[in-house]
Amino acid sequence: MAKKSMIAKCNRPAKFSSREYTRCARCGRPHSVYRKFHLCRICLRELAHKGQIPGLKKASW
């Protein structure tokens, strides 16, 4: 889990637009966040396996 202070810091408007960064909407993780889903790779994988993200399924070939 992300620190509450860092999540609060991310929610404030940045002084410069280049300082803004994405965080996972579910756990607050700052790295490897998919913009389309606003989820990190770990949360995306968990929800996809449970079938909670419509239109997303695990690839198999």
Swiss-Prot record:
SUPFAM superfamilies: Glucocorticoid receptor-like (DNA-binding domain). One of its GO terms (cellular component) is small ribosomal subunit. One of its GO terms (molecular function) is rRNA binding. Its cofactor is Zn(2+). Part of the 30S ribosomal subunit. Contacts proteins S3 and S10. Binds 16S rRNA, required for the assembly of 30S particles and may also be responsible for determining the conformation of the 16S rRNA at the A site. HAMAP family: Ribosomal_uS14_2_B. This is Small ribosomal subunit protein uS14B.
